[in-house]
C-alpha cells in the first residue's frame, strides 16, 4: 500500500484509541454506563472529576495532532492532510476498539485543526469556550465552535482543501450532537459541573 493509504489507516487507528474508556477503567468505572454514556472528557468530568477529564481531553486533542504530524512527515498533499484529519475524527467517533461506537469528536477535531492551522484553531477556541462558560452547555459551545471554525476559515481566506475539511468536521460535530440538540430544545440537557454517580 502507498504511504497515503497507510497514513489514512494510522490516522483512523490513532483516533480510535478510547482514552476516556481506558482512564475510567483504571477507576473501576465503565464510562459507557454512566452519565451520557459518551467516552469523551465531558462525561469523564461528570463521573470522575477534573483531573481524569483533563488527561482524557489532552489525549483526545493530541491523537488528532499526531495523525497530522505523521501525514506531514510523509510529505502528503494538502488534500490528503485534510483526509487524514477527518480519518482521525472518524476513528474517535466510530472506534474499531468499541465496535464502531465512540465519542463526539470535538477534542480530536480541535487537535487536528491545531496542527493544520494553529491561527484558526486559536481564534475558534475562545468562541466555543465563551459559549460554554456563559451557558454551561458543553454541547452548545462545541457546535458553536464548529460553526465558528468554518466561518472563520472563509473569512480568513483559507484554501479550499482546508475550508472543505473544516466544513466536514463541523458537520460531524452536529451529527454526533443530534441528541444533545434535542435535549437542548427540551430543556433537559445536562450543564457543565453536574456530577453523576460513577459505578
UniProtKB/Swiss-Prot annotation:
Pfam families: G3P_acyltransf. It catalyses: an acyl phosphate + sn-glycerol 3-phosphate = a 1-acyl-sn-glycero-3-phosphate + phosphate. One of its GO terms (cellular component) is plasma membrane. It is a multi-pass membrane protein. The chain crosses the membrane at residues 3-23, 50-70, 78-98, 113-133, 154-174. It is found in: Cell inner membrane. Keywords: Cell inner membrane, Cell membrane, Lipid biosynthesis, Lipid metabolism, Membrane, Phospholipid biosynthesis, Phospholipid metabolism, Transferase, Transmembrane, Transmembrane helix. One of its GO terms (molecular function) is acyl-phosphate glycerol-3-phosphate acyltransferase activity. Its EC number is 2.3.1.275. InterPro entries: G3P_acylTferase_PlsY. The keyword Transmembrane helix applies. GO terms for biological process: phospholipid biosynthetic process. Pathway: Lipid metabolism; phospholipid metabolism. PANTHER family: GLYCEROL-3-PHOSPHATE ACYLTRANSFERASE-RELATED, INNER MEMBRANE PROTEIN YGIH. HAMAP family: PlsY (MF_01043). Probably interacts with PlsX. Catalyzes the transfer of an acyl group from acyl-phosphate (acyl-PO(4)) to glycerol-3-phosphate (G3P) to form lysophosphatidic acid (LPA). This enzyme utilizes acyl-phosphate as fatty acyl donor, but not acyl-CoA or acyl-ACP. NCBIfam families: glycerol-3-phosphate 1-O-acyltransferase PlsY. Belongs to the PlsY family. This is Glycerol-3-phosphate acyltransferase. It comes from Thermus thermophilus (strain ATCC 27634 / DSM 579 / HB8). The gene is plsY.
Amino acid at each position: 500500500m502507498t504511504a497515503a493509504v497507510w497514513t489514512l489507516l494510522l490516522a483512523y487507528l490513532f483516533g480510535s484509541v478510547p482514552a476516556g474508556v481506558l482512564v475510567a477503567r483504571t477507576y473501576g468505572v465503565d464510562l459507557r454506563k454512566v452519565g451520557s454514556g459518551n467516552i469523551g472528557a465531558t462525561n469523564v468530568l461528570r463521573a470522575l472529576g477534573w483531573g481524569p477529564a483533563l488527561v482524557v481531553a489532552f489525549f483526545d486533542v493530541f491523537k488528532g495532532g499526531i495523525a497530522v504530524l505523521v501525514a506531514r512527515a510523509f510529505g502528503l498533499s494538502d488534500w490528503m492532510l485534510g483526509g487524514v484529519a477527518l480519518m482521525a475524527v472518524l476513528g474517535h467517533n466510530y472506534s474499531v476498539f468499541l465496535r464502531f461506537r465512540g465519542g463526539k469528536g470535538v477534542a480530536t477535531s480541535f487537535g487536528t485543526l491545531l496542527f493544520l492551522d494553529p491561527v484558526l484553531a486559536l481564534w475558534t477556541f475562545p468562541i466555543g469556550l465563551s459559549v460554554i462558560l456563559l451557558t454551561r452547555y458543553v454541547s452548545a459551545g462545541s457546535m458553536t465552535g464548529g460553526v465558528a471554525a468554518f466561518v472563520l476559515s472563509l473569512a480568513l481566506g483559507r484554501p479550499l482543501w482546508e475550508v472543505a475539511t473544516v466544513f466536514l468536521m463541523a458537520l460531524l460535530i452536529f451529527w454526533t450532537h443530534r441528541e444533545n440538540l434535542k435535549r437542548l430544545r427540551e430543556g433537559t440537557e445536562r450543564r457543565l459541573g453536574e456530577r453523576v454517580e460513577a459505578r
